[in-house]
């Protein structure tokens, strides 16, 4: 056993890798069944959880790298960047209770996922975090962009739903080298609500919508604002009863974020579907399961684990661990006290 680098009741490095691989995609109980199916032996669910969270915590800590704004030229001139939040189920145990099942608080926390890639690339770089606030998400977005090829002479084309925190972080992280475009589909949702109040029938509504889409895509935002202005509701009506006024106010307050003509001319995306999909297959697929509630530090660690795999850093992690780890393993990779909680 010593020559195999395994101690009694321990897990070898290759076995740990298999455990983490299975548990990265499915609940720990199902990972146990997968191990039994493929390797023919039983491992306790608590061991699977401990090994997985230990390595996930290591990956989370490894992702905390300070980053300076690049001074060298970038590998690519145009970088596409997106970030957005999605809710994750979180449980906070009551430290005063001996039985941790009692007194716990359930809530939903926002997991912010970021991605960036060179224009035309189909292999984004991802990042994600729950704790740390919007500043952490912004730094992660910058990190994704730098890894994707952003440099001192690059420009970032950010696309999103117009949330103020995203716009603010694009400005804070990229300054004049960054630009922000509101997702075209998101704008069309405002236009569609207005069209229902303006157009008398389905055919007229469709024609009106197509005219406004064409105006926006060809750089004629003022035409759309004028078309809306002719149908503004009385000021005494509440916003929920005034879709035309709501749409007009939304567009007129974001003129600098609606330059679809320029984006299309530069062959850049006008939609943020990439980040919406990323939330589903990075965060929600593992962290948003029926009946599953996570301690926030464990959710952050599992998010880091899934990001490590999708970014192609999986092999490098295990290779580095093999070089730095001690010969004997005792089911528990070294991890911080916080991530072990």
Please state what every model-predicted region is.
Residues 1-341:
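Catalytic center-proximal scaffold of phosphoryl-transfer enzymes
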């Amino acid at each position: 056993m010593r020559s195999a680098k395994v101690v009694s009741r321990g897990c070898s490095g290759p076995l740990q890798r298999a455990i983490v691989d299975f548990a990265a995609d499915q609940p720990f109980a199902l990972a146990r069944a997968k191990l039994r199916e493929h390797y023919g032996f039983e491992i306790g669910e608590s061991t699977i959880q401990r090994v997985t969270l230990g390595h996930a915590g290591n990956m989370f800590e490894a992702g905390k790298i300070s980053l300076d704004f690049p001074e060298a030229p970038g590998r690519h001139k145009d970088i596409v960047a997106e970030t957005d939040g999605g809710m994750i189920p979180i449980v906070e145990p009551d430290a005063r209770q001996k039985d941790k099942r009692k007194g716990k608080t359930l809530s939903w926390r926002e997991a912010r996922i970021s991605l960036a890639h060179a224009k035309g690339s189909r292999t984004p770089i991802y990042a994600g975090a729950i704790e740390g606030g919007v500043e952490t998400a912004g730094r992660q977005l910058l990190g994704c962009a730098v890894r994707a090829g952003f440099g001192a002479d690059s420009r970032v084309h950010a696309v999103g739903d117009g949330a103020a925190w995203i716009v603010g972080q694009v400005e804070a992280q990229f300054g004049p080298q960054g630009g922000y475009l509101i997702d075209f589909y998101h704008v069309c949702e405002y236009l569609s609500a207005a069209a229902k109040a303006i157009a008398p029938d389905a055919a007229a509504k469709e024609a009106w919508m197509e005219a406004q889409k064409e105006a926006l895509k060809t750089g004629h935002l003022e035409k759309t604002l004028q078309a809306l202005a002719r149908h503004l509701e009385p000021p005494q009506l509440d916003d929920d009863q005034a879709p035309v006024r709501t749409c007009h106010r939304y567009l007129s307050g974001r003129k600098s974020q609606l330059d679809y003509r320029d984006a299309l001319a530069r062959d850049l995306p006008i939609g943020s579907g990439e980040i919406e999909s990323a939330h589903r297959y990075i965060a929600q697929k593992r962290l948003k399961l029926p009946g599953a509630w996570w301690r926030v530090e464990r959710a952050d660690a599992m998010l880091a684990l899934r990001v490590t795999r999708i970014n192609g850093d999986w092999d490098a992690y295990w290779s580095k661990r093999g070089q730095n780890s001690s010969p004997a393993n005792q089911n528990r990779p070294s991890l911080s006290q916080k991530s072990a909680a």
